[in-house]
């Protein structure tokens, strides 16, 4: 039986990977070929992405796969959402893309609502959760500042599209990544021209929109000559990593919610079309583009970012923990010592995350955690309770009964948090695959190659190849009591 080989570049906000996927009949295998860091650059008070370093790492990934001497069918790239690069008339990138955690957009959302368009009107047009860093507020800020990049740009390319441009020389706007921008109409699946008009941004700044599965172009001759490799097509997968991840949920029907767990936690349900009404407006729910015409009705939640930043601070102080050690510390710590709201603005990008947690506790009249184990446990418990808070909203919004929660992404390997989550929500949790973005990326390339035809066929293949972990709810009374305390704290 012939095998097909696909390269997935899966780039997150803290690291990137080159994954070689091999599909032989229904058997899918993944091999991590390279892994590399992705860190925000801090320059003169701003935060940027080093897109040139990312491009170099893509080249290293291609060279490493070439050593394996397998016939590669295609390449796909997925990244985090909202951020973008500018390209000038000569086709050169202008500077470095701003990172979504850059402080320049703080307060701009409220200013936009006051001076340009109300929050409700903007939500009615886009169905997207209002967040400071959405592309629309980044562009609003850059326009006000007469930013050099925007002023001299011929094209705006979202991050996966910018990287595929560097590989192919072809420019596209992939639908799922564009849907994170808060510039698209979810009904027409096109850019909202009225929004572009009020921003003072020309529609010509954006390349043609393509759906997941479209061919972008071939690797450039120069690149192939430099790396001594054959040219292969680059496919527009679901460029938003969460869209690729949700496509990899091993579900047999629609009676589920999903949680894509990583630096960010994205919880939601899959719908056949956008849901924009009073309830979604009130709860600030987002309608992002999915595969095969679906909508990812979801809520962005601060995820493992808080614990990652605690680990970073402790590393500077000379203490390092492996993942199992971290979970062991949390398990041994006292339960429900205090509660935090993971989405509190104080946790967005502080210099010292443990200090930010202590300040939150002081502000809400709680005793702060005392040990590293307590800090970690407080974060995990608070995340689980946050998931219950948000899932209750989706129970209201879903036309289908929610019978289980599928946790996908790197955070699905955290068995303690998975159990806490099952306890908090009172539903079974199905955890895995942890490599959901890469698997979705690869299977969308397989779909483009004609190996599978539909999203459900993709999921059927994935189901055969993953062995998820199952968690059943326990200690209902204890967790219900903790939830009431959590709610009272976050309202302070």
Where are these regions (language model features)?
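N-terminal glycine/serine-rich phosphate-binding loop of ATP-dependent small-molecule kinases
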Residues: 1-95, 124, 224-234, 425-427
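Active-site core segments that coordinate phosphate-bearing ligands/cofactors
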Residues: 2, 7-8, 20, 113-126, ...
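Short beta-strand-loop/turn "lid" adjacent to the catalytic site in phosphate-handling enzymes
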Residues: 43, 63, 67-99, 129-133, ...
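Short glycine/proline- and acidic residue-enriched helix-loop micro-motifs
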Residues: 44-47, 119-129, 205
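Short glycine-rich phosphate-binding loop at a beta-alpha junction
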Residues: 71-79, 155, 208, 397-409
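Glycine-rich beta-strand-to-loop/alpha-helix junction loops that act as flexible
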Residues: 78-81, 212-213, 261-264, 404-412
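Pocket-flanking alpha-helical
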Residues: 85, 107-111, 245-247
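Carbohydrate-associated surface elements
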Residues: 102
């Amino acid at each position: 039986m012939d095998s097909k080989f696909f390269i997935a570049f899966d780039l997150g906000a803290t690291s990137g990977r080159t994954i070689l996927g091999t599909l032989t009949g229904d058997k899918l295998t993944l091999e991590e070929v390279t892994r590399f860091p992705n860190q925000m650059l801090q320059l003169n008070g701003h935060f940027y992405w080093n897109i040139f370093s990312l491009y170099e790492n893509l080249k290293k990934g291609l060279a490493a796969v070439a050593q394996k001497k397998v016939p590669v069918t295609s390449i796909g790239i997925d990244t985090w959402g909202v951020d973008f690069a500018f390209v000038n008339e000569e086709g050169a990138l202008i500077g470095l893309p701003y990172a979504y955690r850059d402080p320049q957009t703080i307060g701009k959302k409220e200013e936009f609502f006051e001076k340009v368009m109300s929050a409700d009107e903007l939500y009615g047009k886009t169905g997207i959760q209002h967040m400071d860093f959405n592309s629309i507020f980044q562009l609003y800020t850059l326009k006000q500042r007469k930013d050099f990049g925007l002023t001299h740009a011929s094209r705006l390319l979202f991050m996966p599209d910018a990287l595929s441009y560097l590989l192919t020389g072809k420019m596209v706007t992939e639908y799922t990544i564009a849907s994170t921008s808060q510039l698209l109409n979810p009904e027409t699946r096109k850019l909202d021209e009225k929004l572009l008009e009020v921003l003072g941004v020309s529609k010509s700044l954006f390349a043609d929109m393509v759906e997941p599965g479209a061919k972008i172009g071939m690797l450039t001759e120069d690149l192939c000559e430099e790396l001594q490799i054959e040219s292969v097509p680059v496919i527009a997968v679901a460029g938003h990593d969460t869209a690729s991840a949700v496509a990899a949920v091993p579900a047999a029907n629609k009676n589920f919610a999903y949680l894509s767990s990583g630096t960010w936690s994205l919880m939601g349900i899959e719908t056949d079309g956008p849901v924009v009404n009073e309830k979604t407006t009130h709860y600030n729910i987002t309608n992002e583009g999915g595969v095969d015409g679906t909508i990812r009705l979801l809520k962005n939640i601060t995820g493992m970012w808080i614990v990652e930043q605690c680990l970073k601070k402790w590393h500077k102080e000379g203490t390092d923990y492996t993942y199992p050690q971290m979970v062991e510390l949390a398990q041994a710590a006292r339960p429900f010592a205090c509660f935090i709201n993971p989405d509190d603005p104080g946790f967005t990008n502080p210099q010292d995350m443990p200090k930010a947690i202590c300040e939150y506790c002081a502000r809400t009249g709680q005793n702060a955690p005392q040990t590293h184990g307590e800090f970690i446990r407080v974060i995990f418990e608070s995340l689980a309770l946050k998931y219950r808070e948000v899932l209750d909203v989706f129970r209201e919004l879903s036309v289908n009964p929610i019978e289980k929660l599928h946790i996908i992404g790197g955070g699905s390997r955290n068995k303690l948090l998975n159990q806490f989550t099952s306890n908090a929500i009172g539903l079974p949790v199905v955890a895995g695959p942890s490599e959901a973005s890469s698997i979705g990326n690869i299977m969308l390339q397989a779909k483009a190659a004609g190996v599978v035809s539909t999203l459900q066929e993709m999921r059927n293949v994935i189901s055969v190849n993953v062995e998820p972990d199952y968690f059943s709810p326990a200690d209902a009374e204890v967790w219900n009591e903790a939830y009431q305390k959590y709610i009272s704290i976050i309202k302070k």
